[in-house]
């Protein structure tokens, strides 16, 4: 039996994964590599502007989806001036998958 805190955390992960847009964001973060000639993103983090461009979503919509992903612990954010850079927390996905296997 999972502890109540673990159940709440897993519920947040499922909520985050319930959206096609958020799953697409996770896909982009998982394949993140710098684009030639671009300096906005490193090999392991992606700027919100790149997510907006790739998905064709408004920056405010990206911000909403990133808030849900952050609340679930699936991504981390780093602010640099007016830009926010996001990183996938693979260990959080692995942990959620392990919890599912134990059910």
Which residues does each predicted region cover?
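Long, low-complexity, charged/polar intrinsically disordered regions in eukaryotic proteins
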Residues: 1-8
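N-terminal helix-turn-helix DNA-binding core of bacterial DNA-binding proteins
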Residues: 8-15, 20-58, 80, 84-92
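Short, hydrophobic-biased segments on the C-terminal half of alpha helices
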Residues: 66-67
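Glycine-centered, phosphate/nucleic-acid-interacting loop/turn motifs that mediate DNA/RNA or nucleotide
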Residues: 73
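Short beta-strand "wing" residues that participate in macromolecule-binding interfaces
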Residues: 77
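Basic, Lys/Arg-enriched C-terminal extension of HTH/homeodomain DNA-binding domains
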Residues: 91-99
């Amino acid at each position: 039996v999972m502890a109540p805190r673990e159940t709440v955390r897993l519920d947040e992960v499922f909520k985050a994964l319930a959206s096609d847009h958020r799953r697409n964001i996770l896909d982009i973060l998982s394949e993140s590599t710098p684009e030639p000639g671009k300096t906005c993103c490193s090999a392991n983090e992606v700027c919100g502007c790149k997510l907006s461009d790739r998905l064709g979503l408004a920056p405010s919509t990206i911000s909403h989806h990133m808030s849900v992903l952050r609340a679930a612990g699936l991504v981390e954010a780093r602010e640099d001036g007016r830009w926010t850079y996001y990183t996938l927390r693979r260990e959080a996905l692995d942990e959620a998958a392990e919890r599912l296997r134990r059910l």
